[in-house]
Amino acid sequence: MRLLILALLGICSLTAYIVEGVGSEVSHRRTCVSLTTQRLPVSRIKTYTITEGSLRAVIFITKRGLKVCADPQATWVRDVVRSMDRKSNTRNNMIQTKPTGTQQSTNTAVTLTG
């Protein structure tokens, strides 16, 4: 009897785990229903993503975590994306060109006299 209950409990747990995994990829999909025409200040935008689908859009994510969909063909949207890309490239270049200090000599040659 205990074995039967343990087996049923195991099956229920496994089923719950599998069912959760099946629908999880849908909830992560980002879609826009409408596009804003109101210009967003670059200083308030943290990052952006571009979606391809039934409604093509740029999703700006503000520093407060709000997601705002905008038309990728709008001039102001292209300007903001270019500005964000420039900031990102500048940060990456600064990180890559940081001085690492002086490098220790790795010469391990030994001269033997004999």
UniProtKB/Swiss-Prot annotation:
Its main location: secreted. It is found in: Secreted. Residues 91-114 are annotated as: Disordered. Residues 1-21 form the signal peptide. InterPro entries: Chemokine_b/g/d, Chemokine_IL8-like_dom, Chemokine_XCL1/XCL2, Interleukin_8-like_sf. Disulfide bonds join C32-C69. One of its GO terms (cellular component) is extracellular region. Keywords: Chemotaxis, Cytokine, Disulfide bond, Secreted, Signal. GO terms for molecular function: CCR chemokine receptor binding; chemokine activity. Pfam families: IL8. GO terms for biological process: antimicrobial humoral immune response mediated by antimicrobial peptide; blood circulation; cell chemotaxis; chemokine-mediated signaling pathway; inflammatory response; positive regulation of cell migration; signal transduction. The keyword Signal applies. Belongs to the intercrine gamma family. Chemotactic activity for lymphocytes but not for monocytes or neutrophils. This is Cytokine SCM-1 beta. It comes from Homo sapiens (Human).
